[in-house]
């Protein structure tokens, strides 16, 4: 896959002297790697992700310096605005884990919140702030990494879908693409929202669904906040050109598709806990995905060839974000949208990625399910994936990220 996970994995493998090919059915970074909020954060993560997020931010900085900052990476800090101590206590596990890992953060009062985002303190008088967090430009990052790794000798083949993975004596032996078969001894599946479908063709079960998030960019606000901001109903990141990339910060659309029923038992706890933030939708997506395996069985084009890029249309909830921005922060009146878009993110039941060997298929490594957190984790995730492929000491302990937890 030619998203950031696949590209960074190839980068670290190439730096270790390996010969790599990246196959992308569409264009590099055309799906969730290029459609996300652009946060590179350590703050507020699941405790299992904290060590990886720390390493990832370090690698973002190192690589961006090598690339003359072609990714748009910058350290800016992340601020979560909170209404009361009860909301702050929801982050107690993360704060404890951050302290264990030596990650500096601050709990701010109203004056501290106002210093970072004037006006926010009126509704959100408590802040959780991690000053070392960063941001980058999603539309720039994947193409920049793709160009860089080609200079290292990696072949990046766009517009070429992988149709399947061949095995000999149970182990990986080749990748079958629409342009031919490539013999190999190691394969990494970093196919984002398409990973579960590809793995199922190998008899591997991965409970993965798609969630659709709608986003927008505003006109430039030269005097606006510099840190990335999250409050209930608003996520805001400053872009390199002074515009703000905004989204609702919690609401998403879940299309009802065949996998919704296939993995219903796995996701029931999520539905019970987060149902208020989830809009279920039954429509064209169901018909499209009903045809997936029928096309495959009949020997026709695979789903990966039929649908090169997931390109959903944004929904109306993004219209409410601009007024929220104007209400809660000073100096952001008369918000105008210059762009709107949407993207699917792949989600797992526990919202923590799988970075793991597939025990049932020797030579196969899986790196997927980043659950909307993958942009910031991409460099750490790619490095850890490469470590597993190479059999060297991993950058962090991968045991909590094992595929076997869904067995």
Stretches with model-predicted labels:
Residues 1-3, 25, 191:
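Glycine-rich Rossmann-fold phosphate-binding loop(s) that bind the pyrophosphate
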Residues 5-8, 12, 16, 107, ...:
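C-terminal lid/capping helical subdomain adjacent to the catalytic/cofactor pocket in oxidative enzymes
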Residues 128-186, 193-197:
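Helical element adjacent to the flavin cofactor pocket in flavoenzyme catalytic cores
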Residues 51-54, 80-90, 128-147, 157, ...:
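Short beta-strand to alpha-helix junction loop
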Residues 5, 28, 194:
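Conserved Rossmann-like nucleotide-cofactor binding loop
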Residues 38-112, 116, 233-236, 241-247, ...:
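Dinucleotide-binding Rossmann-like beta1-alpha1 core, especially the glycine-rich loop
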Residues 14-34:
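Glycine-rich FAD pyrophosphate-binding loop
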